[in-house]
Every structure is written in structure tokens, then in C-alpha cells.
Amino acid sequence: MAQLYFYYSAMNAGKSTTLLQSAFNYQERGMEPVILTAAIDDRAGVGKVSSRIGLQADAHIFDENKDVFALIQSLNQDKKRHCVLVDECQFLSKEQVMQLTDVVDELGIPVLCYGLRNDFRGELFTGSQYLLAWADKLVELKTVCHCGRKANHVLRTDENGDAIADGNQVEIGGNNRYESVCRKHYKAALNMGR
């Protein structure tokens, strides 16, 4: 029975690596996965999913206007698809999350989504908000703060390395602008404590 999975974490927990390993596992068994990634994240090139450890795969891209159900239905008609793997799923819209529930419920294809839970302001991304509400399975992937605690927040820094709490929710960047930290160090960096 197909299900909708949401694998979430702070940055640098291995979400893309886990997605690419899942794709490999399906392919090794002669099965066909569909890989999707957000058009906005072109750090590795448009239509590419890549991990920090050097793994990479081609992917179909989605933006806020893409009907992901129609895309997957069309691909499935051309060739049987055995799963859908979505990288950077925090950038999905509410409608796209609902379309992914239709992929599971109507097409019977498992959907595995990988992404950030919350942004640098400590607020949920739209895609993450609706995946938390609609996914059959929620799986937290863990990474570590510099103090050794579980990191569950993401700090954005300015050009001087100082933590900032203002700005657009989406700004594509890597380790030079973001740091995964625990709640205690997130609050301390933004002077949110008592």
C-alpha cells in the first residue's frame, strides 16, 4: 500500500544523500523512480539533485505552477513508475502537496519527500506545513549542533557571519550563509533568551 512520507531536518543532515540512496535502491531492483526537485534550487545545475558527499542525479523540476500529479501521471503512462522522490519539498505549494496525496491515493505510487521543516526565522515552509499535516509517515533525519545537541533550527548569517532574523524566506545558499544549530544556540544567536 502506497504512502506519503516526509523526511525532514535542519540543513546538512543528509536528506539529498538519503534520497539518492533510495533512488539507487529502486533502480538496483529494476524499478523506475521519478525524482523531482525545486526549480529555485539550481546550486548543482537546473534539474539536478546533488549531495555534499558528491552523489548526483537528474531530476524533473517543479515550480509553484507545476501540476505534479499531471507530470507523474504522464510519466507513469509512458513507463511504470515505482516511487516518487521529491528533493527540496519545502518549496512545494499547498496544492502540490495535495497533488502528491493524489499520486499516492489514485495512482498507488509511494511518494517520499525530503526537505527542511522550518526556515531561518523558525517558521514552517509552506510545503513542510502541509506535509506535516497530510503525510502518512513523518521521519526526522538528525544532524548535530556545534555543541553536540540535536540541531533542529537553521541560522542565516550576513556577510560578517552575524545571525540575522529578517529577510526573504527563500535565499538559496550553502554552508557559507546557513548553520544548523540546536534551539538553545538559535535563541542565543538571535538574543531571544531571557
Curated annotation (Swiss-Prot):
One of its GO terms (molecular function) is thymidine kinase activity. ATP binds at S9, A10, M11, N12, A13, G14, K15, S16, D87, E88, C89, Q90. InterPro entries: P-loop_NTPase, Thymidine_kinase. Its main location: cytoplasm. Pfam families: TK (PF00265). The gene is tdk. Zn(2+) binds at C145, C147, C182, H185. The active site is at E88 (proton acceptor). Keywords: ATP-binding, Cytoplasm, DNA synthesis, Kinase, Metal-binding, Nucleotide-binding, Transferase, Zinc. It catalyses: thymidine + ATP = dTMP + ADP + H(+). Its EC number is 2.7.1.21. It is an enzyme of class 2 (transferase). Belongs to the thymidine kinase family. Gene3D superfamilies: 3.30.60.20, P-loop containing nucleotide triphosphate hydrolases (3.40.50.300). It is found in: Cytoplasm. GO terms for biological process: DNA biosynthetic process; thymidine metabolic process. The lineage of its organism: Bacteria, Pseudomonadati, Pseudomonadota, Gammaproteobacteria, Alteromonadales. Homotetramer. GO terms for cellular component: cytosol. This is Thymidine kinase.
